[in-house]
Amino acid sequence: MNEHPGFCPACFASLAQEADTCPACGARMADLSKRDYREKIVHALRHPLADVRMRAIIALGLRGEPQTADALVKCAMRHPTDVVQGLEIVNSLARMKQTGAGRTALSILQARHPAHAVREGAARVLAALPSEGEADA
């Protein structure tokens, strides 16, 4: 049997190391370990510990997959008082290839995030990007 952390990887409830099934949500540990890596990282954005979320944010930025932009925005909006996390989400979005998804995500943060620093960070990144017409040329 593989050891797992003290949290259920599905619902993040406290979990005994030797458990095969989560008593809170019924998830089987063996099934969860088979998930796609990107899916695991995106799911970690919902973890209750800020440092786990931060590692997931950084990892997603380094992977640069635009299809994760929406999940990053949702994470920023779920934790509006965590400005450091919000700014790292802006950085992660800036590292992504600036497809429509990346620009849209940054625009949402610029317009809607409660923290002024996050809105300003998103605005700076957007201002530094080439216009969509220039990016296509």
Regions inferred by a protein language model and the residue ranges of each:
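Structural signature of alpha-helical solenoid repeat scaffolds
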Residues: A13, G26-A27, G61, M77, ...
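Amphipathic alpha-helical scaffolding segments comprising HEAT/armadillo-like alpha-solenoid repeats
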Residues: E3-F7, P23, L32-A44, E65-R78, ...
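Short inter-helical turns and helix N-cap capping residues of alpha-solenoid HEAT/ARM repeat scaffolds
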Residues: P48-L49, H79-D82, H113-A115
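Non-membrane alpha-helical segments in proteins
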Residues: R53-A59, L87-S92
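Short metal-coordination and nucleic-acid-contact micro-motifs, chiefly zinc-binding Cys/His arrays
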Residues: M1-H4, E18
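Residue-level detector of extended alpha-helical repeat arrays and alpha-solenoid scaffolds
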Residues: A19, R53, A69, V83-G86, ...
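Cysteine-rich micro-motifs
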Residues: E18-M29
